[in-house]
Amino acid sequence: MTSDFKVIIVGGSVAGLSLAHCLEKIGVSFMVLEKGNQIAPQLGASIGILPNGGRILDQLGIFHSIEDEIEPLESAMMRYPDGFSFKSQYPQALHTSFGYPVAFLERQRFLQILYDKLKSKDCVFTNKRVVSIASGQDKVTAKTSDGAKYLADIVIGADGVHSIVRSEIWRHLKENSQISVLEAPNASIKHDYSCIYGISLNVPQIILGIQLNCLDDGVSIHLFTGKQSKLFWFVIIKTPQASFAKVEIDNTHTARCICEGLRTKKVSDTLCFEDVWSRCTIFKMTPLEEGVFKHWNYGRLACIGDAIRKMAPNNGQGANMAIEDACSLANILQKKISHGSIRDQDINSMFQEFSMAQRARTESVCAQSEFLVRMHANQGIGRRLLGRYLIPFLYDAPAGLSGFSISGATRIEFIDLPTRSLRGAWGKSWRGSWEFILQSLVYLRPKFRIVYALYLVAAAAFILYCLSSLFP
């Protein structure tokens, strides 16, 4: 390590290990404090790597190891309650446009690769649950449950949606009267859905490279093929507010009852969910939080990843945005260090710059996720009509929606871009709102653009005119 500046990273998962890799590249000293007893536990979860995450991992020299573990997706099949289905080539379109495949692998294996590729493994500590953080004039101290204390210049919370670092930021803001004592820390977070995720083996009638989606009323089922006959899946189900406590307390029993009730759901013409559920090797249920937290930093403390935002897995951007956060923060830190030592006032400006760089994109990607999870569950007449009667006939529209959010992604600015990423689709602006509908036309095949544009404008105008009052 070449810099005297030191960073404590709380949390050794996707965001934390990605930041560790970035800091290692710029020679900044760090330590990762992970509360669990393993860096890569088997929890039954999968992880989706999209081109925006893949490009950064490629810059870090990691993506080739991940590519060895994946079965790239080529197409996706969407099935509706009335039996209608349509096929989208969006995974292949994204691969062609951005140079990286859409792929899924076990989260455990992904974390193990991130750890194995880290040179400074001696800077990663497990069984280190941070319980408090105290800020001094020129340093910050993190105390762990075993009584140990760790000193650094800044602390970065990569510790998930229930972040202790974010809680400490909130505490400091209140103590210094910078927010109202009545302001709730989770006021911007929604709790409308729960997710059951799992892994099944040797499921019949599965074709490699295809994603299967069953979009039903109040529930959606999503299947992704992986290597070694593995099938990664998750079920998103609308959950009454009164049921969330039950999900958290007894999620195994609740998940089992829900999955048993979905046995007869057809996810394709030849496959029922029973075929998947009966071959399940591991599963877990968790409430889904959605939204962007208001406060990301205070003093020498800042958060990244799920500690600043949480979204449903429908758009596959959760882990990829966490990787982007690590990259963005490292870009800013590298610029500061290149101009000499970092002063106290530089730290606050650095975190403010990070917030400005990531917040607009974060809010847009989260808005897309919120829209997709509700459209997939047929929530609201407007979304139901859009999903069933408009999108299936727009050919590459799913590629347009995904490509729009990927195109404006962050990259590591102090490492050259890999050759495979030098494609024309990168760099288009991400403005959010309803502009994604028009922006999606960029990714359609040229000969279809005019026809689809006219059809889209006419159909959208009709739907908005007749049904705008029906949107929640």
UniProtKB/Swiss-Prot annotation:
Its main location: membrane. Its EC number is 1.-.-.-. It is a multi-pass membrane protein. Induction: Expression is down-regulated when the stress-activated mitogen-activated protein kinase (sakA) is deleted. The keyword RNA-binding does not apply. Glycans are attached at residue 186. The lineage of its organism: Eukaryota, Fungi, Dikarya, Ascomycota, Pezizomycotina. Gene3D superfamilies: FAD/NAD(P)-binding domain. GO terms for cellular component: membrane. It comes from Epichloe festucae var. lolii (Neotyphodium lolii). Its cofactor is FAD. Belongs to the paxM FAD-dependent monooxygenase family. Coiled coil: none annotated. It is found in: Membrane. FAD-dependent monooxygenase; part of the gene cluster that mediates the biosynthesis of lolitrems, indole-diterpene mycotoxins that are potent tremorgens in mammals, and are synthesized by clavicipitaceous fungal endophytes in association with their grass hosts. The geranylgeranyl diphosphate (GGPP) synthase ltmG is proposed to catalyze the first step in lolitremB biosynthesis. LtmG catalyzes a series of iterative condensations of isopentenyl diphosphate (IPP) with dimethylallyl diphosphate (DMAPP), geranyl diphosphate (GPP), and farnesyl diphosphate (FPP), to form GGPP. The gene is ltmM. Pathway: Secondary metabolite biosynthesis. Signal peptide: none annotated. The keyword Protein biosynthesis does not apply. This is FAD-dependent monooxygenase ltmM. The chain crosses the membrane at residues 7-27, 450-470. Keywords: FAD, Flavoprotein, Glycoprotein, Membrane, Monooxygenase, Oxidoreductase, Transmembrane, Transmembrane helix. FAD binds at residues 34, 48, 107, 306, 319. GO terms for molecular function: FAD binding; monooxygenase activity.
